[in-house]
Protein backbone atom coordinates (compact mmCIF):
# COMPACT_ATOMS: atom_id res chain seq x y z
CA UNK A 1 0.00 0.00 0.00
CA UNK A 2 2.90 2.32 0.78
CA UNK A 3 4.34 1.91 -2.75
CA UNK A 4 0.98 2.66 -4.34
CA UNK A 5 0.60 5.85 -2.30
CA UNK A 6 4.18 6.91 -3.12
CA UNK A 7 3.71 6.33 -6.84
CA UNK A 8 0.39 8.17 -6.82
CA UNK A 9 1.97 11.17 -5.10
CA UNK A 10 4.90 11.14 -7.55
CA UNK A 11 2.51 11.02 -10.50
CA UNK A 12 0.47 13.91 -9.08
CA UNK A 13 3.65 15.94 -8.53
CA UNK A 14 4.78 15.34 -12.13
CA UNK A 15 1.39 16.35 -13.52
CA UNK A 16 1.35 19.47 -11.35
CA UNK A 17 4.90 20.43 -12.38
CA UNK A 18 4.07 19.95 -16.06
CA UNK A 19 0.96 22.11 -15.71
CA UNK A 20 2.84 24.89 -13.92
CA UNK A 21 5.59 24.81 -16.55
CA UNK A 22 2.95 25.03 -19.27
CA UNK A 23 1.46 28.12 -17.66
CA UNK A 24 4.87 29.77 -17.65
CA UNK A 25 5.31 29.18 -21.38
CA UNK A 26 1.89 30.60 -22.15
CA UNK A 27 2.59 33.77 -20.20
CA UNK A 28 5.46 34.88 -22.44
CA UNK A 29 4.69 37.74 -24.79
CA UNK A 30 5.65 37.76 -28.44
CA UNK A 31 6.82 40.76 -30.43
CA UNK A 32 4.04 42.41 -32.37
CA UNK A 33 4.56 42.55 -36.12
CA UNK A 34 3.00 45.12 -38.38
CA UNK A 35 -0.47 44.17 -39.62
CA UNK A 36 -0.67 42.50 -43.00
CA UNK A 37 -2.56 44.57 -45.58
CA UNK A 38 -6.24 43.56 -45.63
CA UNK A 39 -6.79 43.38 -49.36
CA UNK A 40 -4.48 45.74 -51.19
CA UNK A 41 -1.47 47.96 -50.83
CA UNK A 42 -1.00 51.24 -52.70
CA UNK A 43 2.08 53.45 -53.13
CA UNK A 44 2.35 55.90 -50.27
CA UNK A 45 1.10 53.41 -47.67
CA UNK A 46 3.63 51.94 -45.21
CA UNK A 47 5.04 48.56 -46.24
CA UNK A 48 6.68 46.18 -43.78
CA UNK A 49 9.39 43.91 -45.28
CA UNK A 50 8.13 41.14 -42.96
CA UNK A 51 5.10 40.83 -45.27
CA UNK A 52 7.36 39.52 -48.03
CA UNK A 53 8.55 41.16 -51.23
CA UNK A 54 6.76 44.20 -52.56
CA UNK A 55 6.72 42.83 -56.08
CA UNK A 56 5.24 45.95 -57.70
CA UNK A 57 5.98 49.16 -55.77
CA UNK A 58 4.38 51.41 -58.43
CA UNK A 59 0.71 50.30 -58.52
CA UNK A 60 -1.97 49.18 -56.08
CA UNK A 61 -2.13 45.41 -55.61
CA UNK A 62 -2.91 42.61 -53.22
CA UNK A 63 -0.52 39.73 -52.58
CA UNK A 64 -0.65 38.46 -56.17
CA UNK A 65 -2.84 40.62 -58.43
CA UNK A 66 -2.53 44.25 -59.57
CA UNK A 67 -5.76 46.20 -59.44
CA UNK A 68 -4.88 48.03 -62.66
CA UNK A 69 -5.04 44.73 -64.62
CA UNK A 70 -8.72 44.19 -63.89
CA UNK A 71 -9.76 40.58 -64.52
CA UNK A 72 -6.54 39.81 -66.47
CA UNK A 73 -4.44 37.47 -64.32
CA UNK A 74 -1.73 36.73 -66.91
CA UNK A 75 0.86 38.97 -65.22
CA UNK A 76 0.12 38.08 -61.59
CA UNK A 77 2.96 37.48 -59.17
CA UNK A 78 3.25 33.69 -58.71
CA UNK A 79 4.79 33.92 -55.25
CA UNK A 80 8.27 32.85 -54.16
CA UNK A 81 9.74 29.83 -55.89
CA UNK A 82 10.37 27.24 -53.22
CA UNK A 83 12.95 25.15 -55.03
CA UNK A 84 16.12 24.26 -53.22
CA UNK A 85 19.50 24.99 -54.77
CA UNK A 86 21.10 22.35 -56.99
CA UNK A 87 24.02 21.24 -54.87
CA UNK A 88 25.37 18.36 -56.90
CA UNK A 89 24.97 16.95 -60.39
CA UNK A 90 23.95 13.30 -59.99
CA UNK A 91 25.21 12.50 -63.50
CA UNK A 92 28.72 13.83 -62.90
CA UNK A 93 31.64 11.40 -63.19
CA UNK A 94 33.56 10.54 -60.02
CA UNK A 95 36.89 12.32 -59.52
CA UNK A 96 39.98 10.60 -60.93
CA UNK A 97 42.21 8.67 -58.54
CA UNK A 98 44.97 10.61 -56.83
CA UNK A 99 48.30 10.60 -58.65
CA UNK A 100 51.44 9.28 -57.03
CA UNK A 101 52.26 6.34 -54.85
CA UNK A 102 50.56 5.38 -51.73
CA UNK A 103 50.38 2.63 -49.23
From Swiss-Prot:
One of its GO terms (cellular component) is pilus. It is found in: Fimbrium. Residues 61-76 have a biased composition (Basic and acidic residues). Its main location: other. Forms a homomer composed of subunits assembled in a large structure. Belongs to the mycobacterial pilin family. This is Pilin. It comes from Mycobacterium tuberculosis (strain ATCC 25618 / H37Rv).
Amino acid sequence: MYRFACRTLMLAACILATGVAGLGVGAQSAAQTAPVPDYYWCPGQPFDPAWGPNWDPYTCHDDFHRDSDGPDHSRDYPGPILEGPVLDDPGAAPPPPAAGGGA
